[in-house]
Amino acid sequence: MKRARMRTSAGRKDVRTAKTETAHVAEEVRARLRENEAIAHLEIDVESVSKGRAVFFMEVQSKHKQMHGVVHGGILASLADTTAAIAAYSTVPAGTHIATVELKINYLEPVPGGRIRAEARVLRTGRNFVVTECEIYNESGEMAAKALLTFGATAGHSLERA
């Protein structure tokens, strides 16, 4: 297991697992996502969050499926967007707002059901943009979709139009 080293107030090294630290961050993110009605409706949940990375999951339900009995592509895109956004937020200064400016997704396998998992990582954080990728896996562990996302980043003010 990966370990994070931290200095105590006495200057000695204190070893804590990265898993414990990310569990705390994941719980904070989970609470914020519950406030978002769209995410709450989709029932997207957090597995882990660390700097530049996020892993989310979703249990497929009938409301996620299109008429052919597989998960709708827009649902997979929403899962990728949400997961990648949290990974992006983890790399920008506090008070920075981000918004998706581009999302490209390739659907590789149909997803008929089960638990799907999204893994996002930041490829580059610049002054105005954050570029990420997100892979979505079906219950069997096969990659079902791959997305490349770019987020615009603005420090200190809201992205809402006046």
What is each PLM-predicted segment?
Residues 1-162:
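Terminal targeting signals and extreme-terminal segments of soluble enzymes
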